[in-house]
Amino acid sequence: MGLGDYSHCRQRMSRGLYGVSGRATLWSPAFHPVHRMPCGTWRIEAPEHVRASSPVLEHLRRQLERAFQRAAARGRARRAREAVAAVAAAAAAAREERSRARMECALARLRAELLELRFQNHQLARTLLDLNMKMQQLKKRQDQERASKPQSPQDEEMNPECGNA
């Protein structure tokens, strides 16, 4: 597409609007100042004689103004929904992070408790082994003492473990 392809558009613009009184020209900011209204919509102010001269143009202007107002309202509503969604997502992420931190803290406590229990288990096992070894040593010493002493009949009656009964 070259620049010459748009010549039919320029011809249509130069012909003007048929059936509408007044002159059809390109919009110029000098003739149509644009003001920003407090509600966030755009409003084009045209000279009073142009407004009164054509009810069709006035109707189109009102329709465009309403369309811009609706579009601006929809844009504000969309931005508000997006802001609410962003806040909700941030809150959900913060809740998730707090939950994750609580879980990690609970896991760390459980690991520490498990380590303490393993240590206590090891100590108990070591104590049981030591006691068992001492019991075996005492039993051997007792057996050696019994074997080295001659048994009298009175000792046999007092000691039921010998098995002569």
Curated annotation (Swiss-Prot):
Please give the residue ranges the record annotates as the region Disordered.
Answer: 136-165
Report the leader peptide range. none
**BP GO terms, sorted:** lung development; response to testosterone
Q: What is this protein called?
A: Alanine- and arginine-rich domain-containing protein
Gene this protein is translated from:
Aard
